[in-house]
Amino acid sequence: MKLSYLPSEFQKALPILEKIKAAGFEAYFVGGSVRDALLNRPIHDVDIASSSYPEETKQIFERTVDIGIEHGTVLVLENGGEYEVTTFRTEDVYVDYRRPSSVSFVRSLEEDLKRRDFTVNAFALNENAEVIDKFNGLADLDNRVLRAVGKAEERFNEDALRIMRGLRFAASLDFDIEEKTFEAMTSHAFLLEKISIERSFIEFDKLLLAPHWKKGIKALLATKAYQYLPDFQETAEEWQSFVADYAEDFRFTSSEQAWAATLLALKHDNPRSFLKKWKTSVNFQKTVQSLIEIFRFRMEREVTKQDVYHYGKDLLKEAETLRQAQRLDVDYERIAELDGQLLIHDKHEIVVNGGKLMKELGFKPGPDLGRTLRAIENAIVDGELANDEESIMAFVQAMKQV
């Protein structure tokens, strides 16, 4: 098969291929970028595979960086771009269900493509826009099927993360998982316990943000892969409710929103403890926790000025979007209106600070000063006190007389 035209992302990288070929080696575009070109999807990273060994690649180009030379990868800096050029290779036995014990460089493209995960990721594309398809990936692409390259059991036993990648591809491409591939995913799902949680997080996060995330969650359920992820041992009913609760075409707008929705559906009591196990950042944990808090109090009451001040209008709107997707009442206008009424959005905007109270009104550092500052802040937020020095000092004087 031949593409009707070579997408601009490949055209920009074409001089890399031409230089490698001029030096007497083979070179092709490979991987997900070729698949995305065939599907008319946006192309992101353009990867190049070559029969040139790393040291040979480095001799061809003036500017290179060793970013994974032991695995055959050299970063080529050319024409204002950065391109990963990886030598054709085969891989030895996988020792930890994630990484091969060793790699061997080869001159054969087919041997290199044989180690790929799925047939739709095992294409190569030459400089003439001709697609090399050694494993019937084009047929799978037409049929929207996700099939492992070769024996599915071997692919997942080599690298258990491919199970999560498969679920993610089902969600992002809207593909069905081929029967034997699905069976191998299910029988090897227990190996996910061997995979670093950081890598599992990346794949699950991408699944949640995919346009067809519901398909990915349904496959996660069907394979029972969720049982081997940290703190995800909930009943199938809770996972099914997660899918059922949201409008069919709903897409999450951020990772934080997606994880908040997940934890809400699974009824986790301690979201921050859960997210800590998934090795997420403190800021990520705080944001997810806040979204969960907002969603829960919105089931009981409407938004107040204090809520807008504490959480910020953007986070409140993000939580409101989850309500809208669950066909619950929303009030974006009230959030915007209350935000417009706030005299301050941060306590540092208050014109009087603790130092001034100590200097002019004799306060000492301690609980009394803290209580007074919080009272000033709350009164300004509630609109009961103007944010000017005269009003604040009078407010404090009145407090001291009570």
Curated annotation (Swiss-Prot):
Coiled-coil intervals: none
Translocase in keyword set: no
Entries under NCBIfam families matching the protein: PRK13299.1
Binding site for CTP: 32, 35, 116, 159, 162, 165, 168
Superkingdom assignment: Bacteria
Binding positions for ATP per the UniProt entry: 32, 35, 116, 159, 162, 165, 168
Key words, A-Z: ATP-binding, Magnesium, Metal-binding, Nucleotide-binding, Nucleotidyltransferase, RNA repair, RNA-binding, Transferase, tRNA processing
Name assigned to this protein: CCA-adding enzyme
Entry GO MF terms: ATP binding; CCA tRNA nucleotidyltransferase activity; magnesium ion binding; tRNA binding
Subunit organization: Homodimer.
Other comments on record: A single active site specifically recognizes both ATP and CTP and is responsible for their addition.
Residues annotated to bind Mg(2+): 45, 47
Family: Belongs to the tRNA nucleotidyltransferase/poly(A) polymerase family. Bacterial CCA-adding enzyme type 3 subfamily.
UniProt cofactor(s): Mg(2+)
GO biological process: RNA repair; tRNA 3'-terminal CCA addition
Classification via InterPro entries: Bact_CCA-adding_enz_type3_sf, CCA-adding_enz_C, CCA-adding_enz_firmicutes, NT_sf, PolA_pol_head_dom, PolyA_RNA-bd
Catalytic activity: a tRNA precursor + 2 CTP + ATP = a tRNA with a 3' CCA end + 3 diphosphate; a tRNA with a 3' CCA end + 2 CTP + ATP = a tRNA with a 3' CCACCA end + 3 diphosphate
Entry EC number(s): 2.7.7.72
Stated role: Catalyzes the addition and repair of the essential 3'-terminal CCA sequence in tRNAs without using a nucleic acid template. Adds these three nucleotides in the order of C, C, and A to the tRNA nucleotide-73, using CTP and ATP as substrates and producing inorganic pyrophosphate. tRNA 3'-terminal CCA addition is required both for tRNA processing and repair. Also involved in tRNA surveillance by mediating tandem CCA addition to generate a CCACCA at the 3' terminus of unstable tRNAs. While stable tRNAs receive only 3'-terminal CCA, unstable tRNAs are marked with CCACCA and rapidly degraded.
Source organism of this protein record: Streptococcus thermophilus (strain ATCC BAA-250 / LMG 18311)
